């Protein structure tokens, strides 16, 4: 028996509207449940295999620790980087940490942060 995929990741956000705008601006991230006026929103990222990102409104009693890194594989990391850099919503609400670069572990990747400071990595395996 083995784990074969990540089905969903849930992160807690301070502002659901900003987070919905941010994640909706990433190509192929589609809201399948909830939305900007909801306390819980699910984005369907992939159908084969099914993969989801959940964002949940942070209650005033809970503190964000920003201890999560989300790594998404993409078909073309460079094209996605330039697309996101030129997207007004992503550029205004997110923060880019690196440009695309090759890593020793066999991926080309870039890092950025979402509106709540969660680290997001987009990567493409290097052939």
Regions found by a protein language model. Give the residues of each.
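Conserved acetyl-CoA-binding loop of GNAT-fold acetyltransferases
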Residues: 25-32, 88-91
């Amino acid at each position: 028996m083995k784990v074969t995929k990540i089905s969903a990741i849930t992160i807690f956000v301070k502002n659901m509207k900003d987070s919905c705008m941010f994640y909706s601006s990433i190509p192929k991230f589609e809201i399948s449940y909830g939305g900007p006026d909801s306390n819980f929103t699910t984005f369907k990222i992939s159908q084969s295999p099914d993969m989801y990102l959940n964002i949940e409104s942070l209650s005033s009693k809970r503190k964000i620790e920003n201890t999560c890194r989300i790594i998404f594989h993409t078909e073309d990391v460079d094209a996605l980087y330039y697309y996101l850099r030129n997207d007004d919503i992503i550029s205004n609400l997110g923060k880019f940490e690196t440009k695309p670069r090759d890593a020793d572990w066999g991926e080309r990747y870039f890092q950025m942060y979402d509106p709540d400071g969660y680290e997001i990595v987009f990567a493409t395996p290097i052939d």
